[in-house]
């Protein structure tokens, strides 16, 4: 019975402070109509890892930090100058726009599908 008060005292010292429980609100997310069409087309094709695409999207929504180097995330140039692109796997890409509080998923597909005229 003597261990119970000791255990209670130990648990009280492990209590989190109010500051350690606070977090920044995740970014608001939106999808372009073209992205939704891309999602349906890619999902039905069975050639692309849609779970990995969803993983990248969730990381972009939840984190303020840049994606890890494995995603090959970079800004685009030319007519896509205000967009970013990350590589989901091989030639499978995600194009998006982002700022501190908002992210918009614009397109997804291969280089030739997204950038050929």
Positions of PLM-derived features:
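Basic, Lys/Arg-enriched alpha-helical interface segments
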Residues: 1-90, 98-104, 112-117
